[in-house]
Amino acid sequence: MTLFLDSSALLSVAIEGRGRQVVIDALENDAQWCASALALSEALALVPRLTDEQVLQDDVEDAVRLLWDRIHIVPVDQMCLDRAAMIAREQPVHINDAIHLAAADRLPRPWQFITFDPAQIPVALSMGYDVISS
């Protein structure tokens, strides 16, 4: 099976918290990991909000990039953006969340969608996604 990580899942690997073990367990049980091309930029943009200490920021960024190097990237091309726009019109999510959902929707099933974003979880479930969260 394939595991699709959104930016919250990608970031949670690098920080202490209950979500970290959820993601690590999921990664250990799946051989193929995917994420939208947006996930890395989104995760890295959040790093300075986690701590003011530059050394800790660098550690988090290194951990995220290390995981990123092992992830298959789903492109955010026009087809993905069109699907994301449709999702955002039909569901109560912001466009950046819809991009992750649209990117995951491009993958052949079965796969699992891992997110800790409370706005994405009900939408992903309503779209028939197998969601992993805490």
Predicted regions and their residues:
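Phosphate- and divalent-cation-binding pockets in alpha/beta enzyme and binding domains
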Residues: 22, 42, 83, 122-123
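Histidine- and aromatic-rich ligand-binding microenvironments
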Residues: 5-6, 35-36, 93-94, 115-117, ...
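Active-site neighborhoods of divalent-metal-dependent phosphate/nucleic-acid chemistry enzymes
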Residues: 71-122, 129
